[in-house]
């Protein structure tokens, strides 16, 4: 065993502890050790003070990333391009319930004390609108595809991704990066996704419609990130614990003013995360959920929910995993130019299932049943996992407050009570 000696290494970013390994003669900073530990499957934790957090945004921009994160816009917390801490929703939280969302002012300056809003990271994996190709009619009357020079894919850094959202990103990766659902565009999807730098934020409180604990997707993120922040507010101190999840995450930490996390700091962060798990607003019994829905395909509950459902598609638009799209061809009046666009669509629109002769699912009953059964049952057959991560967006942003957890519970309870599937 070589001797190790503690040093103080000064840099432009402040002083950090380092150790010298006499066996190999190298000086190891905590960030360098973290990079080596990630390679060996170990995780290191650091702390970063609130007033040093802007250094994180600066380091990401220096690496060529467009930084995306939470910001206030039109009375909601949404995702957009941010420059630093000044753009974060400092001092804001939210109140959520079925069909209800309201911002609340806090009595502190917490940066990440909100729950997930109407936006998800899906819009950067699967853009709401994407031009697939365009063509122009030549002098000979034939259409010629106009090929655009290859454009460098944007390098995104996602700041503020929650545990349920990391699972949603993984689910969409499985859908979009292979198989028939990729639509032959696996290469562009892979480029768009692989270079994303993810700074996760651990939930320290749960929203009124959250049920990620039931789905096993949160509230604590254990993987899928480069760095993970846990916000800790004390009477005289505001800081973050910083967990390293990748080699490039460890490399970025080296550019920040940081310190190894002490045991009491890690304990405070752990208590904050456990508080979120204890506050979960909803729960969903997923035992036998796939078979439960298959057994109750003709259950009267589908008709009952259809009487409330507006078939507006809000639930599918805010869902972080729904991937329905449609393709539309657009021409000019002279027929000289044509473009093909891919746009988000919803299985709640009557035209989505339209084939020759009419729509396959003409009733709201059949469309809601399709959505919920796909999300909780047939998705498992297709992709090997549930399509629901328990984020609760579909509950919050439903205009009439339809609750997927309540609908599943109603079917389960009626079956347990012995109510025949075809009777009210």
Region roles according to the model:
Residues 12-18, 30, 170, 218, ...:
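Secreted/processed peptides and extracellular or luminal domains of membrane proteins
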């Amino acid at each position: 065993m070589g001797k190790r000696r503690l040093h103080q290494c000064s840099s432009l970013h402040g002083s950090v502890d380092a150790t010298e390994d006499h066996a190999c003669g190298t000086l190891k900073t905590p960030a360098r050790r973290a990079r080596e530990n990630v390679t060996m499957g170990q995780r290191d934790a650091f702390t970063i003070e609130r007033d040093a957090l802007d250094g994180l945004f600066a380091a990401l921009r220096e690496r060529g990333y467009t930084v995306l994160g939470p910001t206030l816009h039109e009375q909601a917390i949404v995702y957009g391009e941010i420059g630093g801490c000044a753009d974060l929703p400092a001092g804001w939280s939210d109140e959520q319930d079925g069909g209800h969302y309201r911002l609340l002012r806090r009595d502190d300056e917490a940066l990440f004390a909100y729950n997930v809003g109407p936006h998800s990271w899906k819009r950067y994996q699967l853009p709401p609108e994407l031009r697939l190709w365009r063509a122009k009619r030549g002098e000979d009357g034939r259409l010629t595809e106009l090929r655009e020079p290859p454009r460098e894919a944007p390098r995104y850094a996602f700041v503020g991704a929650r545990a349920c959202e990391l699972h949603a990103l993984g689910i969409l990766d499985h859908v979009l990066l292979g198989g028939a659902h990729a639509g032959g565009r696996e290469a562009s999807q892979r480029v768009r996704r692989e270079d994303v730098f993810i700074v996760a934020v651990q939930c320290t409180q749960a929203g009124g419609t959250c049920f990620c604990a039931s789905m096993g997707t949160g509230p604590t993120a254990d993987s899928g990130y480069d760095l993970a922040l846990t916000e800790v507010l004390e009477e005289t101190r505001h800081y973050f614990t910083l967990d390293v999840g990748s080699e490039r995450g460890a490399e970025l930490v080296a550019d920040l003013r940081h310190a190894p996390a002490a045991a009491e700091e890690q304990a405070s962060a752990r208590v904050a995360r456990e508080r979120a798990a204890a506050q979960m607003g909803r729960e969903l019994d997923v035992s036998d959920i796939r078979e439960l829905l298959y057994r109750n395909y003709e259950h009267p509950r589908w008709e009952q929910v259809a009487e409330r459902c507006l078939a507006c598609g809000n639930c599918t638009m805010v869902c972080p995993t729904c991937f329905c799209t449609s393709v539309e061809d657009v021409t000019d009046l002279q027929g000289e130019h044509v473009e093909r666009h891919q746009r988000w669509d919803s299985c709640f629109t009557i035209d989505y299932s339209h084939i020759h002769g009419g729509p396959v699912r003409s009733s709201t009953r059949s469309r809601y049943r399709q959505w919920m059964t796909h999300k909780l049952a047939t998705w498992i057959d297709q992709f090997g996992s549930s399509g629901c991560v328990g984020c609760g967006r579909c509950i919050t942003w439903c205009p009439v407050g339809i609750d997927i957890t309540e609908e599943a519970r109603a079917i389960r309870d009626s079956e347990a009570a012995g109510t025949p599937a075809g009777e009210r």
